[in-house]
Amino acid sequence: MDPLAQGHEVVILSRSGGDFQWDVSYGYIDPAAFEGVDAIVHLAGAGIAEERWSAARKRELVNSRVRSTAVLYQALSTIPHSIRAVISASAIGYYGADTGEAECLETSPAGLDFLADCTKQWEAAVDQIASLGLRVAKVRIGLVMGAEGGIFPVISKPIRWGLGANLGSGKQWQSWIHITDLLRIFNELLINPALSGVYNGVAPEPIRAGEMNKQIASALRKPFFLPSIPGFLLRLVLGEMACLVLGGSRVSSVKIEKDAAFSFTFVRFEEALKEILHV
């Protein structure tokens, strides 16, 4: 994330490196990290798709989000500061890994699977910060697309090798967002004091997984003819986390467009694809 381009002076709070250190396991934040700071962008959390979901890994996924937020809450409760707003990442996983054809609004209920429960606990921890009188906003982020960041390098790799195939039916909805628009949403939430609560961080036009794959293959001038990989095989290999590739959701961007008069730079996936691949 590069808010510097938006005119912000940024200090980084990290477990290692960065400008200031914190240690979630010990509940410690360097008090100097808050000096002269008027807003926090909270992005902490272990990667959802980096490891198979063992019981221990699932605990880590939840704890890395909930405990880091609790440490932040405790610090904001006790350390003198001039912070007025906290903008936190969240995820469209709040609605569940697979919501079928239903359109998910910010008011839609949470899903019932692990992904939804993890995100629900995360958001509940973030909401505690609002009790301190600070403005709090959460961004339920979809599939982030960028040349080097987000999910695009992962999903495009097998296609680049000529080994692209749909995972499951290919009919799953993919609610995506170009990284540039995601940064613009975070920036809008930082600078606009009228915005609080939860916002979906997705582009206006979701796309079916199969169509997304075909567009990537076409842009890369690669064949896309291999048969779909069946769901049972993916569940056998990936276990519970197969829901990440077999499920999908159709998430609405209307609220951020209406509340912030926000206009997306990349509305359709093919527009984002052209920018990412420079075609």
For every predicted segment, state its role.
Residues 189-240, 277-279:
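Mid/C-terminal beta-alpha module of Rossmann-like enzyme folds, strongest
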Residues 267-279:
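Amphipathic terminal alpha-helices
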Residues 209-214, 235-263:
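Conserved C-terminal active-site "lid" loop/helix of NAD(P)H-dependent oxidoreductases
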